[in-house]
């Protein structure tokens, strides 16, 4: 399966890029379900494995239900503002590879993009998996927007 989602973020591209590359800094911008974020188990911790700005580096996310998810950056280009990363396999998904990148748009703001490919173990899981990732990406984009709205508001 393949997905691509984009959203405009009201912030300069370099600032959004810095936020994205702070690989274990998700708790700064990730919205809780109560704040309008993703429904389901809460993100409890996000720790960095490796050095900040090193490639590879991994973020280990622990959810409220005890599930642990690792995402590892294996390519980062600060000039083109693009990363490639992989997510650890789970009981329903394998081979998740994604790219996140930032483009400047008119007015000094930016667009953030996420493209991914993955396999599902059971063909019946295709639509639910796509819907889940689309919800995750929408929550990420909204978290970025609110982070920069709070930051500029003081």
Where is each model-derived feature located?
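Basic/polar N-terminal segments that are highly enriched at the extreme N-terminus
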Residues: 1, 152-154
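Hydrophobic/aromatic beta-strand elements that line small-molecule binding cavities or substrate pockets
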Residues: 5-7, 69-75, 97-104
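Hydrophobic ligand-binding cavity/cleft-lining segments
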Residues: 1-50
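Beta-strand/loop substructures that line and gate deep hydrophobic ligand-binding cavities in soluble
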Residues: 86-139
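Glycine-rich portal/gate segments that line the openings of hydrophobic small-molecule binding cavities
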Residues: 28, 38-90, 139-151
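Short beta-strand-to-loop capping motifs
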Residues: 9-11, 63, 118-122
């Amino acid at each position: 399966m393949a997905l691509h989602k984009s959203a405009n973020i009201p912030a300069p591209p370099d600032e959004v890029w810095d936020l994205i590359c702070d690989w274990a800094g998700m708790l700064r911008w990730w919205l809780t379900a109560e704040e309008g974020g993703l429904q389901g188990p809460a993100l409890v911790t996000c720790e960095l494995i490796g050095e900040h700005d090193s490639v590879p580096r991994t973020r280990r996310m622990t959810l409220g239900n005890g599930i642990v998810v690792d995402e590892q950056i294996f390519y980062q280009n600060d000039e083109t503002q693009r990363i490639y990363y992989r997510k650890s396999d789970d009981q329903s998904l394998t081979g998740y590879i994604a790219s996140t990148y930032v483009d400047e748009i008119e007015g000094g703001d930016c667009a953030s993009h996420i493209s991914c490919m993955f396999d599902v173990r059971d063909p019946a899981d295709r639509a639910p998996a796509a819907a889940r990732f689309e919800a995750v990406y929408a929550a990420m984009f909204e978290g970025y927007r609110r982070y920069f709205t709070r930051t500029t508001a003081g």
